[in-house]
Amino acid sequence: MMYRPDVVRARKRVCWEPWVIGLVIFISLIVLAVCIGLTVHYVRYNQKKTYNYYSTLSFTTDKLYAEFGREASNNFTEMSQRLESMVKNAFYKSPLREEFVKSQVIKFSQQKHGVLAHMLLICRFHSTEDPETVDKIVQLVLHEKLQDAVGPPKVDPHSVKIKKINKTETDSYLNHCCGTRRSKTLGQSLRIVGGTEVEEGEWPWQASLQWDGSHRCGATLINATWLVSAAHCFTTYKNPARWTASFGVTIKPSKMKRGLRRIIVHEKYKHPSHDYDISLAELSSPVPYTNAVHRVCLPDASYEFQPGDVMFVTGFGALKNDGYSQNHLRQAQVTLIDATTCNEPQAYNDAITPRMLCAGSLEGKTDACQGDSGGPLVSSDARDIWYLAGIVSWGDECAKPNKPGVYTRVTALRDWITSKTGI
């Protein structure tokens, strides 16, 4: 059989007339121009600009100023939440519902006939809007809609004043408030043992305590000059001159460093017992508050965190039992466990005292580990303000079933902190 290749037939070449080619190009250019025009129109009319305002509002209340004038107290939080809700409702009942982002009380000050609330107000308007017109509309909405606000407290709508501020000023005000942090959606985090690294500004109160330059424990910034940590961190290493505190999401390089002026260990702490496991460290000089470094809120002694509350523990500790500390800060989402469950025989068999709390998972999924000691266990309130609930203290290895992490209960020792620091 002879090999027979396929017959390839020549195709007739089709040539377009020049006017057809020109028409196709012309139509293509028109379509491209329309697409570009629509894109520019969309960007121009849909891009939004953030407007930040410093606002003041007068009000009267039956409560004494001393009851809510102290930042982060239960009464401060309650009063702030009421006023923020009033402002939110004012915008939600106006045509500016979609433009309103948030309001936040940053402090209160006394007046001769009442109290002045100092607030930050954040809105977003289309970039094509006239800035002066925006300012007038925001002021008008507050004046008109706050007249319908139902107290207590009783607000004076005509007292509202707003002043436009830039992002740097806004950040500065927020950074000087306790318990604020970078806005970030908190998904399900794994334990610090193999957990997730965090970004700058997520947990700005976290500190690393280092002895002769080596990380030993975590700590929490509670004001510009004081850290709170665990007492057992200083059992062997007592000389403050050899300790340093670093801040930021990495130990090396750090965002900033400070030496320690003095260390205060609770008088009732007796090693190797875990009870009263709390200490304070005074920094050699104050730290400036920034987006990356600022303080957590301390809860009132009377505040009660509830079993089942979702909390976060952070630290530079090991990824496994008897492992090495990490250079990058990690986080773990844990759940508060009631003391009765934690004191059961299969758990800690009545070893949990009123100065302790348990958090984690009875299945052993989440936990802190070596090197996390002294670090923060924090919980947020309805205003998304974060409070120090516990201090990493002890546990049976790391992430073992029925052996959740044990933390020093901050509310139980809140008065001791005040007695030593005035905070």
UniProtKB/Swiss-Prot annotation:
Expression can only be detected in tissues derived from the head and neck, and in skin, prostate and testis. The active site is at H232 (charge relay system), D277 (charge relay system), S373 (charge relay system). Residues 1-19 are cytoplasmic. It is a single-pass type II membrane protein. Residues 49-167 form the SEA domain. Disulfide bonds join C177-C297, C217-C233, C342-C358, C369-C398. The keyword Transcription regulation does not apply. Inhibited by SERPINA5. It is found in: Cell membrane. Glycans are attached at N75, N166, N223. GO terms for cellular component: extracellular region; plasma membrane. GO terms for biological process: cognition; proteolysis. Residues 41-423 are extracellular. Its EC number is 3.4.21.-. The chain crosses the membrane at residues 20-40. One of its GO terms (molecular function) is serine-type endopeptidase activity. N-glycosylated. SMART domains: Tryp_SPc. It is an enzyme of class 3 (hydrolase). Residues 192-422 form the Peptidase S1 domain. The keyword Transmembrane helix applies. Forms a heterodimer with SERPINA5 and SERPINE1. Belongs to the peptidase S1 family. PANTHER family: ACROSIN-RELATED (PTHR24252), SUPPRESSOR OF TUMORIGENICITY 14 PROTEIN HOMOLOG-RELATED (PTHR24252:SF17). Serine protease which possesses both gelatinolytic and caseinolytic activities. Shows a preference for Arg in the P1 position. This is Transmembrane protease serine 11E. It comes from Homo sapiens (Human). The gene is TMPRSS11E.
